[in-house]
Regions:
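Bacterial N-terminal signal peptides
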Residues: 6-14
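Sec/Tat signal peptide C-region and signal peptidase I cleavage site
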Residues: 16-20
């Protein structure tokens, strides 16, 4: 009897964490995003609010039509998204992302960055500062999902995305990072 009770608790916890990993930003309201994703009382194992915000930031930049990474804009983007969601709690997160405009200081044009240069820098950063490398990869992942027309955030798929992107950069070292991001294939999370 004890074993079946433990098994039941494990199954409930397991199903809860798998649901937490996938977020449909087209149907998620701002109020749910703020209460259940960013400030979740019981966050899913491995969840990281900064990486979630980076994914949303990359997604927002791609949806705006821009092809740049703004190195100094994460904080202002986060505050602007927070304000948009507080002012419009019933709005979908996808709509809120469309309304938020990032600070455009210090842009890095992804069309001018060769894939081989990015890959070398990324591998160096992985060795020296894994957390920062993962955070940047999360931004690129959000950007690629938006470019593919998707609207699902699956934090568990960032590793698959990273492997696919790095593999594509190895095959096409002279292509721009932007071109690779718009064509990378990494599995079911790419589209809705």
């Amino acid at each position: 009897m004890k074993l079946s009770g433990i098994l039941l608790i494990f199954v409930c916890c397991w199903s809860g964490t798998s649901r937490a990993a996938n977020v449909n930003i087209a149907t998620l309201t701002c109020v749910k995003y703020q209460n259940e994703v960013i400030a979740a009382p019981n966050p899913a194992p491995g969840s990281d609010p900064i990486n979630t915000m980076m994914w949303l930031f990359g997604y927002s930049v791609a949806k705006s039509g821009a092809h740049v990474m703004y190195g100094d804009a994460l904080a202002s983007f986060g505050f602007a998204l927070d304000a948009e969601c507080k002012d419009n709690p019933a709005e979908s997160l996808l709509e809120a992302l469309s309304a938020v405009k990032p600070n455009t200081k210090n842009p890095m044009d992804l069309t001018e960055l060769e894939c081989q240069t990015f890959a070398a820098r990324h591998l160096d950063l992985v060795k020296s500062d894994l957390e920062s490398a993962n955070t940047i990869m999360m931004w690129l992942y959000g950007f690629a999902v938006a470019k593919a027309g998707g609207h699902l955030f699956d934090a568990d798929a960032v590793g698959t995305f990273e492997s696919a992107l790095m593999g594509d950069c190895q095959k096409n070292p002279g292509r721009s990072l932007f071109d690779e991001l718009t064509g990378v294939k990494w599995g079911k999370s790419k589209s809705p």
